């Protein structure tokens, strides 16, 4: 499994994979990431040469917008599965569709899309004449979710804790050790 981006979400994904006994290769744009015994940091070229599954966990930056394009896809040695729970702008949708059509990409799990704005609520109407979007909707090997993959029980608890702490710090009370 190739992981691009090893911040909080990338690390969390890698930890979840430990129970599946898979080799994890990680590309992170920092020179040296902290060794944690979970995966092996590799160059982008080595990741492209070894990964059968590619999972994206990157922020949106000038380096990541359009990162997964036709050139990147063609440089993957193996046919591969693509997971994008990061930013929709990281994957060029037309390149993804072409990769799916020629079986370079075996399937995709997409929690984010290049076309999405702040929410999914209007995406179907806005993209109704977009052939690439229509292809993704109709593909049996594509799973789309409306940018909710990170909404786990753990993330809800963490969000509630952070909000509670901010409210209490603003009003001068503490919630530590209160249940």
PLM region descriptions:
Residues 79-82, 87-179:
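Rossmann-like dinucleotide-binding domain for NAD(H)/NADP(H)
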Residues 1-78:
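Rossmann-like dinucleotide/phosphate-binding beta-alpha-beta segment
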């Amino acid at each position: 499994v190739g992981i691009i981006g090893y911040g909080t979400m990338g690390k969390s994904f890698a930890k979840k994979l430990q129970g599946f006994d898979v080799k994890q290769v990680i590309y992170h744009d920092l020179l040296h990431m902290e060794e944690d015994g979970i995966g092996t940091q590799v160059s982008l070229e080595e990741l492209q040469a070894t990964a059968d599954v590619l999972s994206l966990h990157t922020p949106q930056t000038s380096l990541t917008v359009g990162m997964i394009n036709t050139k990147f896809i063609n440089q993957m040695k193996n046919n591969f599965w693509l997971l994008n729970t990061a930013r929709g702008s990281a994957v060029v949708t037309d390149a993804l569709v072409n990769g799916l059509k020629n079986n370079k990409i075996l399937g995709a799990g997409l929690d984010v899309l290049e076309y999405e704005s702040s929410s999914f609520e209007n995406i179907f109407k806005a993209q109704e004449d977009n052939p690439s979007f229509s292809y993704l909707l109709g593909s049996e090997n594509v799973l789309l979710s409306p940018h909710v993959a990170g909404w786990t029980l753990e993330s809800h608890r963490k969000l509630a804790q952070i909000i509670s702490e901010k409210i209490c710090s603003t009003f001068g009370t503490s919630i530590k050790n209160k249940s």
